[in-house]
């Protein structure tokens, strides 16, 4: 009937984030692709990019699904960083196959979360520490944390229906979506 690509969150893995929902989706007739994002679970890698590089990985998985299961509609489902990742995938030029996105507790940008956590933990050293982390990301990973913006990505493509689940202030820093 349909294929759902399930994308877990930061420092998690597919079996932790989807142990409850995967059996339900399968029972409802969905074929599932449960992946471990880079630097998580059984996947390799040494740098998490908060959805920036992971988006490209999911696009490759989407291409694989389109080759191996032609004609079946595809849905993307992500939790936390996985939600941000699938929302950025939805912002890419449409393949015509993505029929919908489920985003559970995604963020509009990781920058306020990271800055807020560092400031709360390190006080006045929070801002310089963030700058050092971002510099490390640019040098080692070829990306800046400011590139991760699911909110901006969605402005590129608004034709795909999205279902958002989110609490009120868990992520902090004002980075929850304004749905």
Regions inferred by a protein language model and the residue ranges of each:
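Short beta-strand element of the alpha/beta-hydrolase
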Residues: 2-9
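The serine-hydrolase catalytic nucleophile loop
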Residues: 10-24, 37
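Conserved alpha/beta-hydrolase
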Residues: 24-44
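Alpha/beta-hydrolase fold nucleophile elbow
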Residues: 69-80
